Amino acid sequence: FEMTLACMQRADFIQRIAREAAQDLVMDNVRYAELRFAPLLCTRNGLSPEAVVEAALDGLRGYPIKLLLCAMRQNDPADSMRTVDLALRYRDHGVVGVDLAGPEEGFLPSRHTRAFKKAESAGLGITIHAGEVSGMESLRSAVKEGFAHRLGHGIQLSSTMQANGGLDPLAWE
């Protein structure tokens, strides 16, 4: 991850990465895709978050590809709010939602409820990575306190199969 991030600290590199990802998807006959990345992690060398998003959007221009901006669950919830605000600023330019990524253990989505409530109220798409290593507590928090429309991973849902063969009630909500 660190090596990838090191390559995403210049606007021209971010633009190229986005463009090449879009080209690869189109060559694979993908008709629509959403790329996700954490723009606040691409500011180590002085780029503003806005410049980061604009570079990615420039790289995607002309392709059927949109962006999800990731907040990192281990980071300060204020960073999540900054990410949501950034997504709102660029929602009419190709940003379609936000995502909460990063390590589940010890970092429930409930830490970021304020930011994701704002995203939900504004109509942004919300994806939360949950249920990869942690169980139902993480999944419930993603849906109930993170307002998730989609779950990244969610593989722990299968381990919650009830004895009668049914899914946990959360799966039907």
Regions found by a protein language model. Give the residues of each.
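Active-site glycine-centered loops adjacent to acidic/histidine catalytic or metal-binding residues
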Residues: H129
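Metal-cofactor-binding active-site regions of metalloenzymes
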Residues: F1-L124, V133-L139, E145-R150, Q156-E173
